[in-house]
Amino acid sequence: MQKTQMLSAEIFRRRGHIRKQCPLCKSHFWTLRPDQEVCGDQPCTPYGFIGNPPTKVAVESLRDVRERFLSFFERHGHARIKRYPVVARWRDDVYLVGASIYDFQPWVTSGAVPPPANPLTISQPSIRLTDVDKVGRSGRHLTGFEMMAHHAFNYPDKYVYWIDETTEYAYRFFTEELGIPPEEITFKESMWEGGGNAGECFEVLVRGLEAATLVFMHYEVKDGKYVELPLKIVDTGYGLERIYWLIKGTPTIYDAVFGPYLAKVRERLGVPEPPRDVMAKASIYFGQMDPEVISLDKAYDIIAEKIGVDGKWLREVVKPQEALYVLADHSRTVAWMIADGVIPSNSGAGYLARLLIRRALRGLMLAGVDAPLVELFDLHLKELRYDYPEVWEARSLILELVDMEEKKYREVLKSAPAVVKRALEENRRRGKAGLDKEDLVTLYDSYGLPPEVVAEAAKSMGIEVKVPDDFYSLLASRHVRREKGREATLVEMAKVADLPRTRELFYEDAYMRTFKAKVLRVIDGKYVVLDQTAFYAEGGGQPADTGVLRHSGGVAKVVDVQRVGHVIVHVVEGDVPQEGSEVVGEVDWERRYALMKMHTGTHVLIQSIRRVLGPHIWQAGAQKDIPFSRIDVTHYKLPTPEEVAKIERLANDVVQRDLPVYVKVMPRNEAEAKYGFILYQGGVVPAREIRVVQIGPDDEPYDVQACGGTHLRRTGEIGLIKVHKVERIADGVVRFIFTTGPHAVAYVQELERQAAEAAALGGGSKEELVEVVKRLLKRAEEAEKKARHYAELYAAALAENLKAEAVGQRRLAVVELDDEELAKRVALLATKRDPDLVLVVKAGERVTIYTGGVDVGPIVKALREIGFRGGGSKTFAQGVYAGDVEKLKEAIRRAL
């Protein structure tokens, strides 16, 4: 969509800004300089601040810039709010926060929920992998960055501020706080879109660098079209790292942001610091090049010519630095992610974390750097601990996971030749030559093989493979958004849209067993809508209630209950009630009460798992059922039996303490402010107000989650929590299967019965089970030893007494043996004793040929002529033959 209006601001008229159009990119921009011809943005304008910063303001760290920004906006009436996590657990469309506005989408931006303050200011760590392939190369791109921002939310009945004030704030911040001359600042008109919203914007440019973007958001993006929002939102983004780079004027953004860390890494690895003038010139030219037009390899040659150096020499200087820049950026981003609960894996946010770790590793390998990645990460964690204390708190977990990932990656690389060979052969069979981009994606996603490694392996087989310069960006783009499953509904929404919202009695009183209601609608003779119901509708991993509806015409059995929009639909069998009639509903209380124990038990268990295994534990799925329920959690290895026992003890301690369970409905902002985003253990709750389930007293709650299920009043009602099984169901996901209440008691009793039965078989009691098993194992070991001895004697006897016929200089023997291990032993002994022996072992249609030194090639060839199917090595063959044994012997005789 084109911009709907010329962007202007009162400050431009007041201060004499001139609106111009860039002859190169055709964009309009505002400037104080009559002689400025181009827009001031890359690639139209080269960097003019490298080695020549536009200000002499005294700032020594990112922290200084951040504090200047936040304090400036606090002084101008903005509330400073705490940064959000980088994992967007309050959203169901994306995994990671890509900008500060993500914190407020979709609830605040849609008008459903008020903002935490208005106006507000924040410095939000953000992650974008859109340009991951450019990181380390361009001199300016990052995957992780802090977006400093000020936001204002204008409602139809409440105006805060809009274009004029926003532009004035930006002008004053850059000139007054940072000391940048007014004539150095250009405001370029543009359009911005992200996170489902859009709006016109100003890009704030200084000497070729975009330092901030001022978005005037008033659209929602629906089906590719812009629809006006009820709100007008000021969405600004000031790049903390870019502004610090602008002030410092270093050759690259990495030298400014990660300077102390890079110095330590260079010292540790023995990598010299590059010539500053060369890196500065290279960075300026790299910044002007479009990687979609000019390949990276070609870019080196062009830049080398421009700065008057040899292309090979430039590569040797720059490439090791690129690897260090990638390491610096990726290690910080990965640290943020893991500290926020992301476990590297093959799916979701874990996929992106693994991608960054492996890209950092690959870069170091290509640069010839030999050092444990975990050691280099640790150097960075020590630098990050003051600005990001949560990263330092997660240090041991981060280092353990990085170490595990490096070991996995090195194992993956060993498989490359065989995997690539198979892929090439498969393509050849399908009439396809070589490997294309999609093949490279498949090999990465399925086997973890980076494209450079695939290309090397293919080259050794005489096949050239082109590696796209944007390969990792392509991978990331396919994994940054959450997949939304399509919700199936029992009946069409249109058939119930006119009905009032169903009153949810199961929320008003979870212990209600019977109720009276009026039938509002019957659809297709089996779907019943009531004005109110105590039947719980399936949701949040809790199955629907069952029971009956009694009415004047008989009894209808309720077999399922589902939500369709704002109404609850009962699926019934039997005597269907008439519309307008009165019914008495009876919930299957024994089943419902068991599910309530399972649901409250689930909350107790996941908190116990989190307290034992660590704060990185997040729910990845759950299903409450009878007699067993399951909960899937993010964890990188199978818990030990000792850890599982500790989890079980902790959970049952909560049961024994008989803690109160509170259910309260709270405004979303209030709940998030009080409890944090741990609320969303069970997933996103799409509502202005959320239902909060708290286990334990207010001053010391054991667990708090947003939840729509039915719960007990006290934990003592659970009775018992028993873990049945723990297993890894996917990379980075562990499943706990458990049971509660009477079902847990029944399960324990069954275990006791089995233990007693097993002990009795060994002649003991269940209390003596361990000793009985030890005794039986010892007997079994002795019996196995004797069996091996007798098997050796038997094999020796068979080998000694083989009836072999002479065939020229060879000897031929055919025996029938079903025991494959015995046959191998006989063959080993017999052929060792007689190298000229050809031993044929037949077991049904299976035929195996052993020799001590005789070439079986001619034998196999002869046998194929009579129907043998199989093959083998020089002295061994195996296959299938269904014909006559005498014909088989005759064919072998001819071959010998």
Swiss-Prot record:
Broad class of where this protein is predominantly found: cytoplasm
Known role: Catalyzes the attachment of alanine to tRNA(Ala) in a two-step reaction: alanine is first activated by ATP to form Ala-AMP and then transferred to the acceptor end of tRNA(Ala). Also edits incorrectly charged Ser-tRNA(Ala) and Gly-tRNA(Ala) via its editing domain.
CDD domains in the cross-refs: AlaRS_core
Catalytic activity as recorded in UniProt: tRNA(Ala) + L-alanine + ATP = L-alanyl-tRNA(Ala) + AMP + diphosphate
GO MF assignments: alanine-tRNA ligase activity; aminoacyl-tRNA deacylase activity; ATP binding; tRNA binding; zinc ion binding
Compartment list: Cytoplasm
Extent of the signal sequence: none
Keyword Transferase: no
PANTHER family in alphabetical order: ALANINE--TRNA LIGASE, CYTOPLASMIC (PTHR11777:SF9), ALANYL-TRNA SYNTHETASE (PTHR11777)
The name this protein goes by in its record: Alanine--tRNA ligase
Gene Ontology biological process: alanyl-tRNA aminoacylation
Essential cofactor(s): Zn(2+)
Keywords: Aminoacyl-tRNA synthetase, ATP-binding, Cytoplasm, Ligase, Metal-binding, Nucleotide-binding, Protein biosynthesis, RNA-binding, tRNA-binding, Zinc
Catalytic EC class: ligase
Family: Belongs to the class-II aminoacyl-tRNA synthetase family.
Annotated Zn(2+) binding sites: H599, H603, C707, H711
InterPro entries: aa-tRNA-synth_II/BPL/LPL, Ala-tRNA-lgiase_IIc, Ala-tRNA-ligase_IIc_anticod-bd, Ala-tRNA-synth_IIc_core, Ala-tRNA-synth_IIc_N, Ala-tRNA_lgiase_arc, Ala-tRNA_ligase, Thr/Ala-tRNA-synth_IIc_edit
Free-text cofactor note: Binds 1 zinc ion per subunit.
EC number(s) reported in the record: 6.1.1.7
Originating species: Pyrobaculum calidifontis (strain DSM 21063 / JCM 11548 / VA1)
